[in-house]
A protein has these predicted regions:
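C-terminal accessory helical subdomains adjacent to catalytic cores in phosphodiester-
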Residues: 1-5, 13-190
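Phosphate-binding/switch region of NTP-binding enzymes
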Residues: 10
Length: 190
């Protein structure tokens, strides 16, 4: 039986194009290269608050998945306590929800694999709460492709993942999520 993982982004079109290849690679690194990864599009959520408000109903609808991963932007907030509570609330229905907020935005994870192309110090990129507007948008204009459905995000993320271990070092929350997924494998016996 193949492992099934649902990725819940704040935006399935653009963030989903970054997160799907990342989670596939992460699961391969965890020894699950055949895992099925689905990005949530139904119901389509729009932003952090909307996703949180719908999470219990999403969990009920997708309870047949082995893991649900909610991967929002941190947006300069300290989301850890709220995300932990959300995990606990969903766990009451027997569903495994793991949350991981991208510091500061999901686009940062893509940028980590292209650090040599950036014109800024990496610490500044990581600390910029408007990294999408200040760093990622100019990067995408230069290296993306408007003709691609995701503007080039999927391709750029796949390129970034050639340096997966560097990405996990530059964005330690990704490594933490990987560790939590491995621990979850032990719980479900895979």
């Amino acid at each position: 039986m193949s492992l099934k993982v649902l990725v819940i982004p704040e935006d399935p079109t653009y963030n989903g194009a970054i997160l799907e290849p990342l989670i596939k690679r992460m699961l391969a690194e965890c020894g699950k290269p055949q895992a099925k990864v689905l990005v949530l599009t139904d119901p389509k959520v729009n932003g952090f608050d909307h996703a949180c408000a719908r999470m219990v109903s999403i969990a009920e609808r997708y309870a047949h998945f082995d893991f649900l991963l909610f991967l929002p932007d941190n947006d300069g907030q300290n989301r850890a306590v709220g995300l932990r509570r959300l995990e606990e609330r969903v766990a009451q229905s027997g569903v495994r929800l793991l949350c991981c907020a991208a510091i500061e935005e999901v686009e940062t994870w893509l940028l980590a694999g292209h650090r040599s192309k950036l014109q800024q110090d990496w610490r500044q990129v990581r600390q910029d709460v408007s990294v999408k507007e200040n760093v990622f948008t100019p990067f995408l204009e230069q290296f993306g492709n408007r003709k691609e459905s995701s503007g080039g995000r999927r391709r750029l993320m796949k390129e970034a993942l050639r340096n997966y271990h560097s990405v996990t070092q530059l964005c330690p929350e990704i490594g933490d999520l990987e560790g939590r997924i491995k621990a979850g494998f032990a719980e479900i016996g895979t």
